[in-house]
């Protein structure tokens, strides 16, 4: 009997109700090409194969090959890619949707890799606490860097809370099925790399004002504290709206506010040759 590997974070989804919930949430048609990350025993893969034109499955664990071979005997629209999902070049795969029970230890990096690649819709399984942070609104305890990094690029919603009993082996925590739809055009991010550095800097001190957070985390933007103080003094003189935002506590700013502030700060630094 196959034993899931702890080091790979393997918790196989075995409850057919939640498999169906994930597939239904993806609104699949016979025109859709789906990417799945993590084969497991193929229970989700089979439902995807029934409902989509083609299914790509990325799986790192070759010991699951018997399950893969059995599925490929039954369905001719499944292609298995043996490898690490974080290393596979997703641009070489022509999928438009993603449905997966993600290994939880790669939740964050694989989510942003997928968003960068682009897709029409994703339905992904996460730890429930992680999912709550993804959908959190400003002013709440779960609102943080992850919330803004995701919501500035996609609309997210929790579709279902999933109990440990839905998996084998049972994890110690609840999970959640999350629907993600890229929101291209909703927010304009001037420079993606700068924006991510800006988020890292300010959310290290989420309970402080943006001004204090930027000074205390100035190294994230490659400045020392004295340089950042001087830069912010000059920046504050640009307009009154910026002054209000920069003196507000980080966790109270909306996604829109943070995107706008990051863009203004980026342009300010660029115009003065400080980048």
Curated annotation (Swiss-Prot):
| A GO CC term attached to the entry | cytoplasm
Superkingdom field: Archaea
Q: Name one GO biological process term.
A: rRNA methylation
Q: What class of enzyme is it?
A: transferase
Location relative to the cell: Cytoplasm
| Alphabetized UniProt keyword annotations | Cytoplasm, Methyltransferase, RNA-binding, rRNA processing, S-adenosyl-L-methionine, Transferase
> Which of this chain's residues are annotated to bind S-adenosyl-L-methionine?
13, 38, 59, 84, 101
* Pfam family name, one: RrnaAD
Mind listing the GO molecular function terms for this protein?
RNA binding; rRNA (adenine-N6,N6-)-dimethyltransferase activity
Q: Which Gene3D superfamilies match?
A: Ribosomal RNA adenine dimethylase-like, domain 2, Vaccinia Virus protein VP39
Coiled-coil region list: none
Q: Briefly state the protein's biological role.
A: Specifically dimethylates two adjacent adenosines in the loop of a conserved hairpin near the 3'-end of 16S rRNA in the 30S particle. May play a critical role in biogenesis of 30S subunits.
Sequence similarity: Belongs to the class I-like SAM-binding methyltransferase superfamily. rRNA adenine N(6)-methyltransferase family. RsmA subfamily.
Protein's name in the database: Probable ribosomal RNA small subunit methyltransferase A
Species per Swiss-Prot/TrEMBL record: Methanocaldococcus jannaschii (strain ATCC 43067 / DSM 2661 / JAL-1 / JCM 10045 / NBRC 100440)
């Amino acid at each position: 009997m196959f034993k899931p590997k702890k080091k790979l974070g393997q918790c196989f989804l075995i409850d057919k109700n939640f498999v169906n919930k994930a597939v239904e949430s993806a609104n699949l048609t016979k025109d859709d090409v789906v990417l799945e990350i993590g084969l497991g025993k193929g229970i989700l893969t089979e439902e995807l194969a029934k409902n989509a034109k083609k299914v790509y499955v990325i799986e790192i664990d070759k010991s699951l090959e018997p399950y893969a071979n059995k599925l490929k005997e039954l369905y001719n629209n499944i292609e298995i890619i043996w490898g690490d999902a974080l290393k596979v070049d997703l641009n070489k795969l022509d999928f438009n949707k993603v449905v997966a029970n993600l290994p939880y230890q790669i939740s964050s990096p694989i989510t942003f890799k997928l968003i960068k690649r682009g897709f029409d819709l994703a339905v992904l399984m996460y730890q429930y606490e992680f999912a709550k942070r993804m959908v959190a609104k400003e002013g709440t305890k779960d609102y943080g860097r992850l919330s803004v990094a995701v919501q500035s690029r996609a609309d997210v919603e929790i579709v279902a809370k999933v109990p440990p009993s839905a998996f084998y082996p049972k994890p110690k925590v609840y999970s959640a099925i999350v629907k993600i739809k890229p929101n291209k055009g909703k927010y304009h991010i001037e420079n993606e790399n700068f924006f991510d550095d800006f988020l890292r800097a300010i959310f290290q001190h989420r309970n402080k004002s943006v001004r204090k957070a930027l000074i205390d985390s100035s190294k994230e933007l490659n400045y020392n504290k004295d340089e950042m103080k001087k830069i912010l003094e000059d920046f504050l003189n640009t307009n009154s709206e910026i002054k209000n935002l920069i003196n507000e506590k980080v966790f109270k700013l909306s996604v829109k506010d943070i995107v706008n502030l990051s863009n203004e700060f980026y342009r300010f630094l660029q115009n003065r040759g400080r980048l």
